[in-house]
Regions:
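Post-transcriptional modification and biogenesis factors for structured RNAs
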Residues: 1-177
Length: 177
């Protein structure tokens, strides 16, 4: 077994990415404080052909040198938009028949491994602020809340790690559904 070089990975071009069939997921980032986290999230969304990232509130927007450091060019491939208020984004997505899923620790949350993907559904997955998480009013607007089980002493993941875990899980469930 040998490690592959970047030139051997057969990655698609940015143009091919833009023209390819996307995973029916929109990732919403609400008031994410760290531009480095935003850049890392762009990379994860590129990796799984996510349809769009919707940046909300104080979340940094491209072009931004701090995003660029961790995004490694993925802001050029992944479609993104901005809403000042996440509630407006949610209302628009509901009109477009998206299932609104918040990722948060909540009393009636669904364990991520038990969340069932429905074929032909489109998903909008909301990730909240690094300190306060997803706002309760946003949870109230959601169709479901999923939670990543945790077993250590800390009560949260870094938001970019959380996005990677959840998006990979949804991606694999959609592709095998």
């Amino acid at each position: 077994m040998k490690k592959l070089k970047n030139s051997e990975l057969n990655r698609i071009s940015i143009e091919e990415f833009k023209n390819s069939s996307k995973t029916p997921i929109k990732v919403l980032l609400d008031n994410i404080r760290s531009a480095h986290n935003v850049g890392s999230i762009f990379r994860s969304c590129d990796a799984f052909l996510i349809d769009e990232i919707i940046l909300c509130g104080i979340t940094a927007k491209p072009p931004n040198k701090e995003i660029r450091k961790t995004a490694l060019g993925s802001t050029d491939s992944v479609k993104w938009s901005y809403f000042e208020n996440i509630k407006d984004a949610i209302l628009k997505l509901k009109q477009e028949k998206y299932q609104i899923i918040s990722v948060e620790q909540a009393d009636k949350s669904t364990d991520l491994k038990n969340f069932k993907i429905q074929s032909k559904k489109k998903y909008a997955i909301i990730f909240g602020n690094e300190i306060n998480g997803v706002n309760q009013k946003v949870i109230d607007m959601s169709d479901d809340v999923v939670e990543i089980p945790q077993f250590g002493t800390k009560h949260s993941f870094n938001v970019s790690v959380c996005v990677g875990i959840v998006v990979w899980d949804f991606f694999t469930k959609i592709k095998t559904n």
